[in-house]
Amino acid sequence: MKHLLIIFSVLLTSISWSKDVDWKDLIKRDGLWYEKFTNEPFTGNSTGLKQGKVKDGKKDGEWLYYSVNGQLYLKNTYKEGKKDGERLKYYDNGQLMEKGNYKDGKRNGLKTDWHKNGRKESEGNWKNDKQEGLLTAWYENGQKRTEINYKNGKKEELQTRWYENGQKRSEVNYKNGKQDGLVTEWHKNGQKSFEGNWVDGKVDGVVTFWDKEGEVTKTDTYKDGKLVEGIKL
């Protein structure tokens, strides 16, 4: 009798998991997935353009998402309804667009993005859904575009940007997510275009502007973010 009960239980589980329902016939209520016109959290397989398992109303395991033309554009992994594991996103030509990881519903670890031509677009680390450490971005031609440091999701220390031709575009210092310290910008030809100082997110002191030939065109003086004096040369 005991063996019969075990077999019966296994059969019930197998039957419930084998139930296939088109994703359009699943609805979400209070964080759980239900088959339309039912009151029991769904357990089974979602089919069609959104394919994956649902257990007790929660997504579980690998899910595949397709466009209307049948092109795979997203892979997500779930555990008890939360993203947990690798995430892959694709362009319509099949080229990988994004690769990252989640843990307990939050983005964690290395995240990499690619341009449609296959060249890397950006790369940086995440911790508990916040950017952490160095984020680097590139133009489609492979030239470095930006380097930004993050701490607990906020910009910290030096941020550097470049033009597409490789010439440095700007250097900005941050502290706890706010501009703090020297800010310098350059024209595309390499001549300095701007320089000023920030304190706790506000411009403070003398700021200077240059034209593309290297001549000073204007100087302004600020105090606590407010213009005190401006001189146009």
In which residue ranges do the predicted regions lie?
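Glycine/tyrosine- and acidic-biased, solvent-exposed loop/turn segments at the edges of beta-strands
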Residues: 13-233
